[in-house]
C-alpha cells in the first residue's frame, strides 16, 4: 500500500479522475498472519522524520470473519479452493452484498467501479521472490494492449517487467472478475517482497524496509528464484518506485490509446 500512499500525497491529476484506495480491506491491517512472526509495524525514515506504518496481513482478520469453511466456494463461479481463501479479497471478486465480510468488501469495490464508470483499474500487490508471477503485470484480455504498451515504455527506462494474461479459469481475482463484471480495463501489478517468502531468514522491520536476506541470496545462486536477488536485496523504496513507474507508464499508455479520455497525472515521484 506504500505506492498508494505516495500517490495520495503527491499525485495531481490534470486531466481525468484518479481514485486511490490505500487499504482495499481495512480489516487486514488489524492483525498479522499467525505463526509467521511478522512485526505489527515498520518505520520509514523521511526528510520530515520517521513515519510508522502497520504491516498487516493479506487476509481479513478472523475477528471480522470466522470460522473458515473446510472448502471455500467462489460464489459466482462455484470454483472450490482451500477454506482459508474465504478471507482473501483477491479470491472474492466480484463479491456479493449479502455474503461474507470479504465478499462485501469485494462487492463495494466492484460497485464503486460500476457507479463511477472507472475506465482502468490497477490492483497493486507484492509477492515472494520464489513466486513465478513477480515483477509483472497481469492483464485482463481487454487490457492487454495497454499493458503491452506500458511494458515497452518501461523497458526504454531499463525497468523490466513481465506480462501475464489473466487466467480465465482461476476465479475471484481482481484482474479477471473486475474485467468481466464491469467495463474497466483490469490490471494487477506484482513487485517482490522477501518478507512474504517461504525461504526468508529473520523476519523483522529491517527485512520489510531494507529487503536484504542472506537466505534469498543463497536461493538466487541455486536458481530457485524468479527475480534477481543480490546483496543489495529488494528494498521497499525500490519496490514502491517500480509500482509508481509502472503506474505512470499505464497512465501514459491509456492516454495515447484513448485520445478522447485523457488520464494525465502530474507530480508523480520519479
Residues covered by each model-derived region:
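Active-site/substrate-binding loop(s) of hydrolase catalytic cores
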Residues: 1-152
Amino acid at each position: 500500500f506504500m505506492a498508494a500512499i505516495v500517490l495520495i500525497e503527491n499525485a495531481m491529476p490534470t486531466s481525468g479522475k484518479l481514485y486511490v484506495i490505500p487499504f482495499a480491506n481495512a480489516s487486514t491491517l488489524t492483525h498479522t498472519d499467525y505463526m509467521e512472526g511478522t512485526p505489527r509495524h515498520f518505520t520509514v525514515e523521511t526528510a520530515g522524520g520517521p513515519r510508522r506504518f502497520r504491516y498487516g496481513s493479506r487476509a481479513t482478520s478472523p475477528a471480522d470473519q470466522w470460522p473458515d469453511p473446510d472448502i471455500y466456494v467462489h460464489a459466482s463461479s462455484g470454483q472450490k479452493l482451500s477454506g482459508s481463501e474465504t478471507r482473501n479479497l483477491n479470491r472474492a471478486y466480484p463479491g456479493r452484498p449479502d455474503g461474507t465480510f470479504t465478499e462485501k468488501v469485494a462487492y463495494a469495490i466492484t460497485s464503486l467501479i460500476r457507479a463511477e464508470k472507472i475506465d482502468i483499474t490497477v490492483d497493486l500487490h507484492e509477492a515472494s521472490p520464489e513466486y513465478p508471477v513477480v515483477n509483472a503485470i497481469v492483464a485482463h484480455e481487454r487490457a492487454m494492449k495497454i499493458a503491452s504498451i506500458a511494458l515497452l515504455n518501461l523497458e526504454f527506462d531499463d525497468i523490466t517487467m513481465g506480462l501475464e494474461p489473466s487466467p480465465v479459469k482461476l476465479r475471484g481475482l481482481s484482474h479477471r472478475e473486475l474485467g468481466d463484471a464491469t467495463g474497466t480495463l483490469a490490471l494487477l501489478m506484482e513487485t517482490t517482497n522477501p518478507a512474504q517468502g517461504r525461504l526468508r531468514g529473520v523476519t523483522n522491520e529491517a527485512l520489510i524496509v531494507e529487503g536484504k536476506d542472506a537466505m534469498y541470496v543463497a536461493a538466487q545462486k541455486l536458481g530457485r528464484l524468479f527475480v534477481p536477488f543480490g546483496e543489495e536485496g529488494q528494498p521497499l523504496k525500490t519496490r514502491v518506485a517500480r509500482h509508481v513507474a509502472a503506474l505512470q507508464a499505464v497512465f501514459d499508455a491509456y492516454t495515447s490509446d484513448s485520445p478522447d479520455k485523457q488520464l494525465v497525472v502530474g507530480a508523480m515521484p520519479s
